[in-house]
Design a protein with these regions (language model features):
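Non-catalytic, substrate/partner-engaging modules appended to enzymatic cores
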Residues: 1-291
Length: 291
């Protein structure tokens, strides 16, 4: 089954027990449908909970929300830990929680997805590819570090040979580079081809991760101004994510106190508005600090 025929609404955490719908397009015959059902038990650490027919293909972003159960391990004093957790929850009921993007957006243990996105935004395709394939870090297994170092040293064939099974996306890119290297020196077109060898959701994830990185920075700076305090110029949204307008500062503050509305930070892009006043200057300074 071609990867291009598969669709899903969002990426899931790698190190978690997750459940989601995945669709496969063009499954018209009953024989094809049966073949999918027969895959049960053949995919590593994957169970099929239900196989049904649908009318439309699932696409990235068609996600209503996520629901989590969080497990905390290696607790010495359960009662004391529960007391601490409850005290924290009581405080959060008053202040709220900053809506940061988590580690899964940036990659773990190798946190580099946003760095690839940064290079893409700067139109440095060669560096974007290097940051994904090369750039070894001590957080990875030694064999992966050697494969990445071989790439940085310019040894594409050796890098491919050293890559572990888990480096399937890196292998896709290196194979494309090896193919283009046989035609001549690698140029921007070759690096573009390497990036296009990746699944489209992953290609989009790079720039999304960089947006998220900038957003997290802006959130941290906004939290420093007071997470549950209205600041003149804030763009305020209600719980339906509609912009709230024409309120006095006191009315805005009352909405925030009652969790009926929230201050925002920008998910940076070409059409995203900045806040006004001090908050807007802060949001612009985030961009300036990475140029």
């Amino acid at each position: 089954i071609s990867r291009k025929r598969m669709g899903f609404a969002g990426m899931k955490d790698k190190k978690a027990r997750t459940r989601q719908w995945i669709c496969i397009s063009n499954m018209e015959s009953e024989e094809q449908f049966r073949q999918v059902k027969d895959l049960e038990g053949t995919i590593y650490k994957t169970d099929f909970l239900k196989v049904v027919r649908g009318r439309k293909k699932l696409r990235m972003g068609q996600l209503k929300g996520n629901k989590f159960q969080i497990l905390i391990r290696n607790i010495d004093d359960i009662e004391k830990s529960a007391e601490i957790a409850n005290n924290i929850l009581k405080e959060l009921e008053v202040t709220g929680v900053p809506n940061y993007f988590g580690w899964q957006r940036f990659g773990k243990p190798r946190t580099n997805t946003h760095l690839v996105g940064e290079a893409l935004v700067q139109n440095d395709l060669k560096e974007a590819v290097r940051r994904y394939i090369g750039n070894p870090t001590s957080e990875e297994h030694e064999e992966n570090q050697k494969a990445r170092q071989a790439y940085d040293d310019g040894n594409l064939e050796e890098s491919l040979e050293l890559m572990s099974k888990g480096m399937r996306y890196e292998k896709m890119m290196v194979r494309e580079l090896i193919k283009d290297a046989k035609k001549g020196p690698l140029d921007d077109k070759a690096y573009k081809n390497a990036l296009h060898a990746l699944p489209k959701p992953l290609q989009r994830m790079f720039v999304h991760a960089y947006q998220s990185y900038l957003f997290n920075d802006a959130v941290s700076r906004r939290v420093a101004m007071g997470i549950n305090r209205y600041v003149e110029g804030d763009i305020i949204i209600d719980n339906e994510e509609r912009i709230v307008r024409d309120k006095t500062p006191e009315e805005f503050q009352n909405l925030i106190d009652n969790f009926e509305a929230n201050p925002t930070s920008p998910l940076y892009g070409t059409k995203v508005p900045f806040a006004g006043g001090e908050v807007g200057e802060m949001e612009k300074s985030v961009l300036n600090s990475y140029n």
